[in-house]
């Protein structure tokens, strides 16, 4: 089935915090909400620490999620697939209230299945960012994701 940009209504959904204590607020800004399979996702990640923190390592990737929601039986496990990790910076200084902006480009696979919702299952796409803090300390991994729509026809 071919799904093109004219077939979808897309809007920017709120950023989802997946894990962490939000000691550093991470925002993902994208050039657009809809991408064609094989296209490059262009955007930027903005880190805004809430306090002085150990230096951090930031990386981004695409994520495909399949949800199972059958009508007549228990849902299956679904699953997630993460794309190639794109490192954006190592040992980034994280100082209270000082934003750090890092641009990125993430290539989508040419054979990426489109975002779709059907009776029994759905496929959703995201851009995710993850921030690791340096050293052995009490600071948790921070992870966020923003949904995108993937189509397979112009």
Question: What does each of the following model-derived ranges do?
Answer:
Residues 1-154:
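C-terminal beta-sandwich interaction modules and adjacent acidic
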């Amino acid at each position: 089935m071919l799904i093109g940009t004219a077939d979808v209504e897309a809007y920017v959904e709120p950023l989802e915090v997946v894990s962490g204590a939000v000691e550093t607020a991470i925002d993902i800004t994208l050039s657009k909400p809809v991408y064609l399979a094989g296209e490059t996702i262009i955007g930027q990640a903005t880190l805004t620490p809430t306090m002085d923190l150990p230096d951090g390592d930031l990386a981004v990737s695409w994520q495909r999620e399949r949800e199972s929601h059958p009508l007549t039986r228990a849902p299956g496990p679904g699953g997630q697939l993460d794309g190639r990790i794109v490192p954006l910076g190592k040992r980034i200084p994280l100082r209270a209230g000082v934003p750090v902006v890092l641009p990125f480009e993430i290539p989508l696979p040419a054979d990426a299945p489109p975002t779709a919702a059907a009776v029994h299952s759905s496929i959703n796409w995201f851009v995710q960012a993850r921030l690791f803090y340096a050293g052995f300390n009490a600071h948790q991994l921070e992870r966020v994701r923003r949904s995108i729509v993937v189509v397979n026809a112009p």
